[in-house]
Amino acid sequence: MKKNLYIFYLLIVFINGCDLFSTRTPEPPINKKTAFIPPTSSDVVVKNLQSSISEKNVDNYIACLTDNTDITGKQMFSFIPTSDVFAVYSSVFQYWDLYAERRYFNTMINATPRDIIPDLKLYNQQTIPLQQDSVIYVFDYLLSVPHSVDGVPKAVSGRMQLTVNLKHTNGLWSISTWIDTKSSNDSLPYSWSFLKAKFSN
């Protein structure tokens, strides 16, 4: 009898100590903050492009580029590199598409230390409305990406021309054509095209 009481008391102490029947408070989900804004106007696309780079967020970066296709199923997004880079890396840019954009961006970001924040500065903006659903933006740019790869510039400059279109199926804007050129205002010898080529593998 005493032995049974002893076991009973032990069970009570064990249950109270472990608190087996209490409900555990769930941990709050980990949400990574992002500055990405639904691109319901053309100018938001440019802001999202800048924030996706500083946040090193490949999904937000790709979301800035159109995923529209023509009647044959071919992607309508096109990137046209600087002429000097294309002369050397024509095979790289011959079939450049969204997958190539994702690949280069991921490679570049993976080579950048976690505590380092890339930066895209845009200057001398020109805005050229084409139609109600199409706008051209022209900027001089300075892109700084302090990565750890030897032989690849950590900062590039040039002039970018972005054709931004409205997708009528969802009411969102995105970049359909991106033209990269050198300009007389360039402070650095290498362009964004060169950076894309070097990180494309």
Question: At which residue positions do the language-model features occur?
Answer:
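Short, low-complexity N-terminal intrinsically disordered segments enriched in polar/charged residues
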Residues: 18-55, 63
